[in-house]
From Swiss-Prot:
Organism the protein comes from: Shewanella sediminis (strain HAW-EB3)
GO CC, alphabetical: cytoplasm
SUPFAM superfamilies referenced in this protein's UniProt entry, alphabetically: Actin-like ATPase domain
Higher taxonomy: Bacteria, Pseudomonadati, Pseudomonadota, Gammaproteobacteria, Alteromonadales
PROSITE patterns xref list: GLYCOPROTEASE
Residues annotated for substrate binding in this entry: L134, V135, S136, G137, G138, D167, G180, N272
Protein name, entry field: tRNA N6-adenosine threonylcarbamoyltransferase
Role: Required for the formation of a threonylcarbamoyl group on adenosine at position 37 (t(6)A37) in tRNAs that read codons beginning with adenine. Is involved in the transfer of the threonylcarbamoyl moiety of threonylcarbamoyl-AMP (TC-AMP) to the N6 group of A37, together with TsaE and TsaB. TsaD likely plays a direct catalytic role in this reaction.
Coiled coil (UniProt feature): none
Domain of life: Bacteria
Enzyme class, UniProt record, top EC level: transferase
EC number(s) stated in the UniProt entry for this protein: 2.3.1.234
Length: 337
């Protein structure tokens, strides 16, 4: 089976073609980073309009790169949610229109299921069951995964997601958008031990996260310290260490609770070098293994949507002609495959 996947949940337009025998045949991506940089964050209306401009050329490019015609495509998958409703509707309209005009089945994919399954695009594929840590700009959650669609949300953020905390703290430090990667780059120049940030909600039972307090702590620290490059780097280092330690502590707690020996880490924050190193050490100490998608599949992309959609289309999960976007969509409400 061969599926065209479309991703438009936020500020990346991604289109890919995935074949269940040959693997990933093409992967095209357009980022709106330059468009939103002047505003310090994503402007939903501008994001939607830019998706409209870019999506048709990217579909054509993905088909050409895969050496495919419409006759070679067996189904269409598009991100149905969660995300920015206007952006979602652009991808949903395109996906539904292509499916209808080509006479192919279509399915709306959960954005976070796409991230969760992104490591399946690699050569070293995790076996079920496993624990998934999903960390992005909009979500931070720990999920017990018994199979595709068999998800138990063990813990999630009660306020800011980890990626959101990175971006907001970066903005407080005067760093350009996108702030998270720039903060991590600055943190690499910092020295440890100068500041001690809290590790939120690690002093109590449970697996939920809270990162808004870290942002406030960072704001207060920035306000009272000298505004020189090394001080800013030291603050960035302390902030990053606090986020990574918090995620690591919760992962260890969840692994002990579930007994799983495999950990999948996905979403935009999974590209963070310190997080990868820390969790690799954690799993090695526990005799387990950690799995990540490659860097280009940590952020939003069409390849993960094509893969996830293919699994659901093969299981007969076909949607009607209605065009729907789900800005809020609990992961654990998905049907099993």
């Amino acid at each position: 089976m061969r599926v065209l996947g479309i991703e438009t949940s936020c500020d990346e337009t991604g289109v890919a073609v995935y074949d269940d025998e040959q693997g990933l045949l093409s992967h095209t991506l357009y980022s709106q980073v330059k468009l939103h940089a002047d505003y310090g964050g994503v402007v939903p209306e501008l994001a939607s309009r830019d998706h409209v401009r870019k999506i048709v050329p990217l579909v054509k490019q993905a088909l050409a790169d895969a050496n495919c015609t419409l006759d070679d495509i067996d189904g269409v998958a598009y991100t149905k949610g969660p995300g920015l409703v206007g952006a979602l509707l652009v991808g949903a309209c395109m996906g539904r229109a292509l499916a209808y005009s080509w006479g192919k089945p279509a399915v709306g994919v959960h954005h976070m299921e796409g991230h969760l399954l992104a490591p399946m695009l690699e050569d070293d594929v995790p076996e079920f069951p496993f624990l998934a840590l999903l960390v992005s700009g909009g979500h931070s959650m720990l999920v017990g995964v018994e199979g595709i669609g068999q998800y138990e949300v063990l813990g999630e953020s009660v306020d800011d997601a980890a990626g959101e905390a990175f971006d907001k703290t970066a903005k407080l430090m005067g760093l350009d958008y996108p702030g998270g990667p720039r903060l991590s780059k600055l943190a690499a120049k910092g020295e440890t031990g100068h500041y001690r940030f809290p590790r939120p909600m690690t002093d109590r039972p449970g697996l939920d996260f809270s990162f808004s307090g870290l942002k406030t702590f960072a704001a207060n620290t920035i306000a009272k310290e000298p505004d020189d490059e090394q001080t800013r780097a030291n603050i960035a280092r302390a902030f990053e260490e606090a986020v990574v330690d918090t995620l690591s502590i919760k992962c260890r707690r969840a692994l002990k609770q579930t007994g799983y020996k495999r950990l999948v880490v996905a979403g935009g924050v999974s590209a963070n070098t310190r997080l990868r190193t820390t969790l690799a050490e954690t799993m090695q100490a526990q005799g387990g293994q950690v799995y990540y998608p490659r860097g280009e599949f940590c952020t939003d992309n069409g390849a993960m949507i094509a893969y996830a959609g293919l699994q659901r289309l093969k299981a007969g999960h076909i949607e009607d002609l209605g065009v729907k976007g789900e800005p809020r969509w609990p992961l654990d409400t998905l049907p099993a495959v």
